[in-house]
Amino acid sequence: MENSHNESEEQPQSTPKVEEEQPAVEQSPENQCSEDDQSSEDLSSEEQSSDEEFFPEELLPELLPEMLLCEDRPPQECLPQKNAFEDRIPMEQPPCGIGKHKLEEGSFKERLARSRPQFRGDIHGRNLSNEEMIRAADELEEMKRVRNKLMIMHWKAKRSRPYPI
């Protein structure tokens, strides 16, 4: 019986707190969000704090433009949706795995055959003396030999295991 009496006392105390919080939010005229967003923010104050921990604005501004536009801060700090991506500096080279060779048509062998003359041009395209050309060709041959040796060693090591990994 005492527990039910304590619970009834706690409920009236908690409801005025909610009523006191709501007028404070309604008094801010700078709020750019709609009234529906305000009511949902009041109801999920705990969820907001957890969202802020996992998704800080500094790390993901382009992914959360709606949040940035709805916040209570001066308009010069808010990022408009249109300019969020335009302000980025374009990359000089695409990241690994994305490049012209991915966009070109044809099979892997065709693309490889097209790229091979580029490597030949490294030696023959330059104005080198005969000695320099011979040295460059020797270096390429040595690289091929070492590569083949490593491939053979890898194949032997892989084949000599009694059980596959």
From Swiss-Prot:
Statement: the UniProt record of this protein carries the keyword Transcription: yes
Statement: the UniProt record of this protein carries the keyword Nucleus: yes
UniProt KW keywords: Nucleus, Transcription, Transcription regulation
Primary location: nucleus
Protein family (similarity comment): Belongs to the TFS-II family. TFA subfamily.
Stated role: May be involved in transcriptional regulation. Modulates various viral and cellular promoters in a promoter context-dependent manner. Does not bind DNA directly.
Identification of the protein by name: Transcription elongation factor A protein-like 1
Source organism per UniProt: Rattus norvegicus (Rat)
